[in-house]
Amino acid sequence: MVFAMLVVCWSIFLGLWMLVSRLKQSRDKICPPKGPPRLPWIGNLHQFPLKLLHLRLTEWSRTYGGFYTLKLGPVTAAVITDRQIAKEAFDRNSAISSTRHTNYATEFVTDGTHLLTMKYGALWREERKILQQTLKGSVCDNDHMRLIDAEQTQLMRDLLVNPSDYSAYIKRASTSIITSLVFGIRTPSCATLHLQELDAINDDWLQLLVIGGALSEDVFPVLKYIPSAFLGTFTKRLKGIRRRMRRLYGTMLNQTITRQRESPAPPARSMIDAVLNQREHFNLTDRQIEVLAGVTLEGGFDTTTSMLLVFVQAMTLHPECQERAYVEINALCGRHRIPQWSDRNQLPYVNMLLKETMRWRPVTTLSPPHVLEKDTTIRGTFLPQGSMLILNTWGLHQDPNVFIDPDRFDPMRYEGYTKLAADYANAPDAATRDHYTYGIGRRICPGIHLADRSMFLAIAKLIWGFRFEPQRDEQGNSIPIDSNPVTGYTVDKVQISPKPFACAVIPRDKEGEKTILREFGVASEVFADYNLDENASL
């Protein structure tokens, strides 16, 4: 219905737009297009799928190279599947390549204050600074690892109790880490109300970003002139997502404000505590604080959950990798101590395992498009102001010139890669970059330090405590696991995640079980620092 309405409106304005476009052509600098053939006026829009776009762009890169252009209506889009060109376009040209297009759907839902989709400017820099101060490496090491360790120890305890619900327990742990750090509010169980609501909102939001990306006002200029009432059920959907976001994030913000009034010096200080205590310095409205908190929740729980499920899938399919990692961990820790973050430098294979997990099935297959604020030329191709720059993360990770047999899961690709992802992202030589799952340029994921630490520790703990094996049917045969990126993964959202798969999570031994239960008792002392009000009204 929405698409049909857009087609009708597009037809109404097409004549005027064609006239304006012809007048502009006389001023535009023209260069031969390098990319798939395009049609007049619509360019490549008819070839632009809403599902599996990363596979289409990667397929084109095999034909047209690591840098080619598309035409999406009046907008030029440059697709980058080359490390050196990515470094040039997003890092060296970051002063002009860090903004976003105006997006009808996300503007409607968030009032233009969502950090992921917000245009580059003063507010973006202010909110980004808050996240960087909260999530930088030194703060993670000194302040956050205690909580992360405790939450992942509960994950191990939960898996002892009911291993068949491994997916739900992974989501709970990932959610509790981020809600605790953002609001000082834990997510103690899978039944916690805000977990269920956040999960539902995030699912709608990620699907909306796919549709919303197609509703850019720069790609469809007519959207600027269409009253929202004419978009019918789509507008109702946007209003519903907006209402639910405001209810959840606003409730959690109000809980934090109330707690501050009742206890001015809480044992554990959250990001929102810090923002509220420095309101005059940050100069943010309640609405901006609310959306900033929501951005952090959305980015922190779902991606980590999906990446840990990718890890579990990879271990189930590759027992030899799992066993090698276990031997390394057990040689260091034995059965009376669970791995800690401080063990990282002595666990090189676990580090390789993490990096290969991030490369093999990156949950973010394409970066949200950056937009040029000025005309520029990249590798001899002129790109006008307003052009999109799309980082093809999937294509970079599946490049056979960089990774031999790229679809094979092989942690040994990263032998000698001893640093964290942020170090390689900031390195001057693009050839040394480990992976692009966290993005690139000024808009690289601000949670890169937290996510890398959380993922490493979860992987080390899970391998120390459990074996991951295929489940068996009644005849004792292994139930196949589909890791195919087309059939085995979700494809209707901007992020991918494994579809449910049959995995047996088996505790390694009784001694390890005793250690997990003992360490969970210690973790419970950490949880006392956080608000456990899981029954607050939403």
Swiss-Prot record:
Any GO BP: terpenoid biosynthetic process
Keyword set, alphabetical order: Heme, Iron, Membrane, Metal-binding, Monooxygenase, Oxidoreductase, Transmembrane, Transmembrane helix
Native source organism of the sequence: Penicillium polonicum
Membrane topology (UniProt): Single-pass membrane protein
Binding residues annotated for heme, in chain numbering: C445
Protein name: Cytochrome P450 monooxygenase verH
Gene that encodes the chain: verH
The protein's role, per its UniProt record: Cytochrome P450 monooxygenase; part of the gene cluster that mediates the biosynthesis of the neurotoxin verrucosidin, a methylated alpha-pyrone polyketide that inhibits oxidative phosphorylation in mitochondria and thereby causes neurological diseases. The carbon backbone of verrucosidin is synthesized by the HR-PKS verA, and further modified by the other verrucodidin cluster enzymes.
GO cellular component, one term: membrane
Bilayer-crossing regions: 2-21
Pathway annotation from the record: Secondary metabolite biosynthesis; terpenoid biosynthesis; Mycotoxin biosynthesis
Transmembrane keyword on record: yes
Keyword DNA damage: no
